């Protein structure tokens, strides 16, 4: 069956837009709108986000339970209150809808900024699309996080280290994950500027919330945030023991299959970190696009599959990594490489949808954190390819 028509353009008024781009934004709008019209109970995550701003300005502990406002607890840093502020002051449902669309647009923008050729760009969007909808159904912040990580790489490539450092610092002070962007220091032509800008933005965004709260409260809030993250890690492991929706990670798979629920994450994360570091010995490839993009892909995947906080909507970050990994593969694709991508699309992305049998989803995929498995397989392949990078080098024009 020929699917080349997917890469065609359609005309909207005076403008031409690709079918995939059109579907990306239409589905995003429909997805967010469908949650908004179901009522406040369906946008609980957004209520948590809104609460960060409201509690920051009223100087209430950001990390306590507020059952009269929302369910669950907040685990985002105080800087997040500034990002959500413009939406929080809007009428609830309008703010929520625009928040969801911002996430869809920002990830789209980041993917476009990778400057792949048109077909490859659309392939990345297509691979990410189902997972984006999963995240938007939960009005999550994860597409924004994926975009920050991608842009931290893009801006290093564009020699705009001040912007790369800004993405890393702001992301770190809201949800930690974008700290992986510091690896792109290796690819910078202005390493001193990269470090200095990083220090500047870290201090800037750390203190910026004082414009809406007091210095004393902000200082205490950082201690509260740290404690909430420690508590969250412990709760994730408890959730894993119950076969819940948290700890959808490599460690979660190990804990759930082995039923050794006190299995320590460091037995996985430290070896994983070492495997990520080992290919850095190939210094002569630091300027090579394939090498850089492979690193971008495994860092996006690592952020999720080695986090005990990972849940299904978090996987838009990892799947963005899978999409980048696919683009750098040498053609013609081997059966093994094609099978790995199909495995990820089916078990990671489609398993969260109603297209997947509920019995299998509930009794196997969720119970054993199997959503992480295809991304882990691709992560292993990506690390292996980085170690043998000389066999992967492509002409940059192929992207």
Q: Model segments located where?
A:
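Small-residue packing motifs within transmembrane alpha-helices
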Residues: 14, 160-167, 194, 317, ...
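Aromatic-enriched
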Residues: 35, 326-399
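A cytosolic-side transmembrane-helix exit/cap motif
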Residues: 145-146, 165, 215-222, 312-320, ...
